[in-house]
Design a protein with these regions (language model features):
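Conserved PLP-enzyme active-site core in the AAT-like
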Residues: 1-67, 144-148
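Conserved small-domain helix->loop->beta segment predominantly found in fold-type I
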Residues: 58, 67-93, 97-147
Length: 150
């Protein structure tokens, strides 16, 4: 499961509850860490127990078993220091606050979608009145009328 943006799920469900075998939680989109400016976004990768033997290992603490891919990076600790930002964000909000943040993400996305819908085509909502935490605008008309290109 792509957990790059968990804004519509945090506090309400989880990748495990949805029966995902693997989920990468990219922290910059959901838990307030900066993206870029020192490296790519990062975050934990959660797996179900049956996949643990296939996980990569750390070069200084573990020896690869026969099914592991071994070490996949030369960065000893990755961007571990950035995890303190997400930890503080979650700790300060608490369980109720994290859930409320999810509700606001969904509310804000739907508010903006409704405000922009008269002016832009919205992709992937055919027959639906609401979106989850995001929506995709078709900017083809704007690009043609202004000459702005990618």
């Amino acid at each position: 499961m792509d957990g790059a943006n968990m804004n519509a799920q945090v506090g309400y469900t989880s990748p495990g509850y949805l029966n995902a075998d693997v989920c990468h939680l990219n922290l910059h989109k959901t838990f307030s860490i900066p993206h870029g400016g020192g490296g790519p976004g990062m975050g934990p990768i959660g797996v179900k127990k049956h996949l643990i033997p296939y996980l990569p290992t750390h070069p200084y603490t573990e020896k690869p078993n026969s099914t592991s891919l071994g070490t996949l990076t030369h960065s000893e600790f990755g961007s571990a220091s950035i995890l303190s930002i997400s930890y503080a964000y979650i700790a300060l909000l608490g369980k109720a606050g994290v859930r409320k943040s999810t509700a606001y993400a969904i509310l804000n996305a739907n508010y903006l979608m409704k405000r922009l819908q008269p002016y832009f085509k919205i992709f992937c909502i055919e027959g639906k009145e609401r979106c989850s935490h995001e929506f995709i605008l078709d900017l083809t008309g704007l690009k043609k009328s202004t000459g702005v290109s990618e």
